[in-house]
Amino acid sequence: MTRSSQILAIRAGSLFDGERALGPGMVLTQSGLITGIDTSGAPPPADSLIHDFGDGVTVMPGLIDCHVHLSLDASPQAMANVAVEDDDVLLRRMELASTRALHAGITTVRDLGDRRFLSLRLRDQLTQNSIPAPRIVAAGPPLTTHGGHLAVMGGEAEGADELKAAVHMRAMRGCDVVKVMVSGGATTPGSRPHDAQYGQKDLHLIVDQACKHGLRTAAHVHAVTSIVDALEAGFDSLEHVTFFTAYGVASDQHLIEQISQSGTFVSLTIGSVPDSGKPPPAIAQRLEQIRANAARLCSAGAKVVLGTDAGLSPGKPHDVLPYALEALVDLGMPPDRALHAVTAVAADACDLHGLKGRLAPGAEADLIAISGDPLKDISAVHNVVAVYRDGHLVVDRRLKTETSMTA
C-alpha cells in the first residue's frame, strides 16, 4: 500500500495511547505515520481529511498478538494438516488467517512457528500485492530436537554446528526472531511438556548466535526446568510459562519473582473462544493451576504480553485475541494494564518500540476504533468498527468523513 501524503485527522470521544487514557481527542497522520495527538479541542489542520467517529468510540493503537501460527488452520487436525498440505494451499490459508486477524483489530502478529519459512513468503506476497494484513514478525520453523516438539515444521537441529547453522539460516532468510522449543509440548506424539529438550550449553549458544545476528529469541517453556534454563540463558521472551513437572503444575513463587525481576517478556497463551471444546488433555487437566500461576505472574509485575497460540485448535482461531484480553482481566489485571500489554508492551516484545503499539509522533499509523470504552468494559474490544494500517483505512464498519476547510 502506498502511503498518502494528505493529513488525516481521526477524531473520537476517547483516546488510549498505549499507556493511558487521554479523553476526547484527535490523532493526526500523514504518509503512514502518526504526526500528532491533540486533546485540546482545536480544529483539524486546513484541508485535512477528517474521520470522525464521534462520542462512544475509543481510538487506540492496533492490537498485537505475540504468539500465532498462521500456517495452522484452527481445526482439530491442525497439526496433521500442516504436515501434508501443499505450500500454495497453506499460503492461501495463511493469507485468509491474516485477514481474519486484521478484521479483529490485530495489526501485528508474531508468528512463532511455520513450515519451511512460509510466513516470510506470505509477508513478501502481501507487500508485493498491496494486500492489507497485519505486520508479520516471523520466526520461521522453530528450533527443536530431532523428532522433538513440532519437528514436523522442519526446524530440527542439535549440537553446536547444527544450531549455529540454523540460527545463521534464519538471519539470512530475513527472520526477526529465533523460536526454540526448550521443552516438549502437548500436541506432538511422544513429546511431553514437562520434559526439557535442550540443555544449558545449547541454549547459551543459541542466544549468543541470535544476538550476533541481531535477532530476538523466544523460548517455548512448559517445564519448570526449562523455564529456569531459558531465563538463565537470557532469552528475550518466555512462551506459555505453565510450570509443568512430571507430577502436575508447580507453584513456585520464588521462580515467579525471578521472572518478574528479570524484565524478560512473558507471553501468556491464554484465552479461547467459549464453548469451542477442550484444550489438549495435558493442558486441560491442569488448567486451573496454570491460570493461578498466570495470575501470580501478573500480580508480581512480570512483563506480560498476550500470545494466543492462534491456529492451534478450534478454540484458537486467528481472531481470538479479544477473548485473551478478557481472560487477562479475569486473572486480575486492570483493563488499562491489559490494553497496555497488547499494545505498547507487546510492541517492545516484538522489537518494534517506537514503531508500533503507541499513539505517539513518529509511530506507524496502525490504529483501531472500538465502539464503547474497553477501559471500563474490556469486552468492548470485540466491537472493532475501524482498522488502520500504515494510515490506510482497511476495515470500515462505521464512519463519518469530511474535509476540513479551516486553518
Segments (PLM) and residue ranges:
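Active-site core of metal-dependent hydrolases
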Residues: 188-292, 300-312, 332-334, 348-350
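C-terminal cap of metal-dependent C-N hydrolases
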Residues: 13, 342, 348, 361-406
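Active-site mouth loops of central-metabolism enzymes
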Residues: 79-92, 148-165, 216-218
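Divalent metal-dependent hydrolysis catalytic cores, especially in the metallo-beta-lactamase
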Residues: 93-119, 133-144, 175-188, 215-216, ...
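His/Asp/Glu-enriched, well-ordered alpha-helical/loop segment
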Residues: 288-373
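Metal-associated gating/positioning segment near the N- to mid-region
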Residues: 57-128, 201
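N-terminal metal-binding scaffold of metallo-dependent hydrolase/deaminase domains
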Residues: 1-45, 57-59, 372-378, 392
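Active-site gating/metal-coordination segments in enzymes
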Residues: 147-204
